Amino acid sequence: MAKFSALCSLALLGLATAQKPVGTETHEKLTTFRCTVAGGCVEKTNYIVLDSITGHRIYQPAAETLDCGARGAAPNVTACPTKEACAENCAMEGRTDYGSQGVSTDGASLRLQILHDGKKVAPRVYLLDETEAKYEMLRLTGNEFAFEVTMDKLPCGMNSALYLSEMEEDGGKSELNPGGAPWGTGYCDAQCYVTPFINGEGNIKGNGACCAEMDIWEANSRATHIAPHPCSKPGLYLCEGDECGSTGVCDKSGCAWNPNRIAQPHYYGNNDTFKVDTLKPMTVVTQFPTDASGKLAAIRRLYVQGGVVIKAETVHKAGLPEVDALTDPFCEAFGSQRYMALGATGGMGDALARGMVLVMSIWWDETGGNMQWLDGIASGSGPCNATEGAPANIPLVEPNPEVTFSNLKWGEIGSTFQGGARRL
């Protein structure tokens, strides 16, 4: 396992200049690949950084037992009456051992565990570029992205997520956030969540942090889901009131492609009777082809398992077009009204062309929904009953839920994978 440390300084800490440095931040090194049809894949070096809020201790140095706020609300009003005071009064402690947060790398593999010594850690991490100073910006319109995944330890209720967020390349680095990307700041997505800090600065007004989100992979061993989530505003947008809601600036639901929801229950599952057997490692390929004008026209999925390419099946369900990829006609027929209203596939492609940050995480649902939207019988999304995906029940089935993402590759369509005869 390769790890790289940088001594925290006032310029790297992510705090105002009056704040003292607090230790070191150690990034995990990860080998990735850039690919072309003519030249094949070239090895590159990237780094992994934990999210600033969920992966670090943020506290008040003047009263170290006190934090500076919780997810879902503006920051602590005593510590953060203003952004400037918030930067002065709140410290973020560096992480020297990502393993304690369920994160480890080995060459081209990234392992994420939801539990560490029996305690929930649910890590969310971002991909830094080779300098460790900013995020790697992926521009996938007209290209494809591939990765290998081992996920046999993800039962009902788990979610291994690999997706893109239109975060800022520098993580919102500023006078009040001199740390930026190396400290995992700047997260946003189409759910427009309220967090104590946005772009590393105190979120005094309690805004939501909105931006386009491309869910390439949300999955466990029982169900999988692709969902683009376009927004009407480019980049990070601070929403207020109704702008943050279900009819606001971002498509919260997205247009989902889940084999179970399109009458293909035999396609993906946890034994060898399924076309894609989740108990075995697989390569997941997602393609983003364009039309003649250069606009994103579709989002296409295929798998490679055992040296065999497994294409997406053509939809044969009443009311839906007979397509084998996520397209505007599919999304419109599926009832994805906000998706269509907020730019649809072309709008998602615009965000992908501008550049997005790669996010990877593992989590379970503690809101009471038990991840039924992803894998539940009631929602038509999978084979899981209403209670087996409850966080209290998951460790009874699998004591150590985890996922390993390996060999991340992106480049020209057709350049990231190899396989034998297609299996339909």
Swiss-Prot record:
GO terms for biological process: cellulose catabolic process. Keywords: Carbohydrate metabolism, Cellulose degradation, Disulfide bond, Glycoprotein, Glycosidase, Hydrolase, Polysaccharide degradation, Secreted, Signal. Its EC number is 3.2.1.4. It holds the Pfam family Glyco_hydro_7. Induction: Expression is increased at 72 hour of infection, and then the expression level drops back to the lower level for the remainder of the time course. Disulfide bonds join 35-41, 68-90, 80-86, 156-384, 188-211, 192-210, 231-250, 239-244, 255-331. It is found in: Secreted. The keyword Signal applies. The active site is at residues 213, 218. It catalyses: Endohydrolysis of (1->4)-beta-D-glucosidic linkages in cellulose, lichenin and cereal beta-D-glucans. Residues 1-18 form the signal peptide. Belongs to the glycosyl hydrolase 7 (cellulase C) family. Monomer. This is Endoglucanase 1. The gene is egl1.
